[in-house]
Each structure stands twice: as structure tokens, then as C-alpha cells.
Amino acid sequence: AATQKVLTDNGVAPYDSKEMNEALGLIKGLVDDGSIHPDTINISAPEARELFAQGQAAFLCQGMWCVSQWDANYPDLNYGVMAVPVPDGVTNTYVQAGELSPWMGIYKQSKHPKEAAEYLMALYDEQYGYQQSNVESGSFVSCIPEINEKYMTNEHMKQYYTIAEETSRVVPTLVKRDEKANDFYAEVKDVQPSLGAIVQGIISQSITDYDSALKTLANDTTTEWKRASEAVGMDYSSLEFPNWDATKDYTDADYETLK
């Protein structure tokens, strides 16, 4: 499950899948052979960017937001952008992409919805220049493809954008399928230790039996998702997308076939 993207596989939370175990096994291997920076657990994202820029790390798993920061603070930094690495011989691997949409919306109980709408229209209007300036500087990718195509001049951002287009696929989202999804997300409680906590445990070497930890997380999370679904009156089966092919974008037509 990603942020606001709870999905099930055959009715259960898929945290203990073969692929998840292999991913955590890879992380453990990197820890065991000394590949992971010893300060990884204790530093913030900005601090990690600094370590990379100062030559203390050869590879950094972060996002496009690093580009503008390095251009501003380390204009002579010689670096490149690459796709997420995969094991030798593995093909058809992709990263998830949300639907191309703005990151802000209007609160349904807003006292000034008209003014809010006008603000958002201006914010995403090419003439306003906000989208244009951020794309040109390499700060982020616009949700408007035409603006990206017209104003993306930063070479590192171009590399990122090309790789993202080739290696990402739109995944199904519960919010688009069920009107009670937001109520569900408001109700559901985090299960601990979370996946992030388990990964941190592997890196800090406080967790060695990650297989058992993943099984516990999957079982407890499934129980919690069922509880939250019942609490808000949402059909638990809405979390299952049996027609999802992870190698393809999930489309409106795919949602329609589930009705």
C-alpha cells in the first residue's frame, strides 16, 4: 500500500509477497556488504542531498526535487539520473504513478469555493507563469503535459522525465472507485511496525527476521482494513482490482469493467 493507495491481493494486504521479501532481502544484502551509508537512518532528506553533493555517497534514492536544489547550491556538480535498478535478467518492472492531476483541491465545505476555484485556475494557467517557472528551474514536473513539453529545458529534469515516462505505470486508486474511500482513509489506523519501520530495522540491524515481520504486518493490516471498511460502510472487496495488469496503465475503461 502506498500513501492513499490501499490495495489487496486475493483479499489480503500484500506485504508478505514474494516480491516484497526479495526487495527487503536486497536491502539486507546492501547493509551486510557495507553499501548503505552508515548515517542513513539518522539524517533528513536535505542532509542526504548534501552528503551526495559532497561526494560522500555515490547513489541517492530521491526524486526530481533534488535537481533545482543542486543547481542552486552546487552548480558544478557532475551527476546523472537513472532508472530504479533491478536484478539481472528481470524485465517488465515499473514504478507506480498516480493519475496526472493537481496536488490541490477545494474543500467541500469551503466558505469561498468560487474564489478558491479562480485561484487554482490562475495557478495552473500558463499565463500566470508559476507552472512555467517551476518546470524551467527543475523544481517539479507540471500536471499539464503541454507545459512540460514547452518549458522543460533543464537537462537533468529532461532525463528524469524521460525515464519516468518509460518506467512508470498508472495504478488503480480506491478513491476513484468508491465514494467512501476518503472516509475509509480517515478511519484506518496505522499498523506497527509499519513497512517503513521494518526497512529501518533492517538498515539499523535491529530486525533480522524480516520475513516474520512482513507476515505479521500483512495479517494485522488485513484485519485493520477490514475493520475500517466495516466502520464506514464500505465494501471491503473494493480494495481488490482483479483486472489490473501492472505492466499497463490502469484506465477509465478498466474501472468501468468493475461496475
Give the role of each language-model region.
Residues C66-D76, D88-G98, G105-A197, Y236-S238, ...:
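C-terminal lobe and pocket-closing loops
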Residues A1-A13, K28, A57, G233-Y236:
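Extracytoplasmic/periplasmic solute-binding protein
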Residues I207, D211-K259:
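Conserved N-terminal structural module of periplasmic/extracytoplasmic solute-binding proteins
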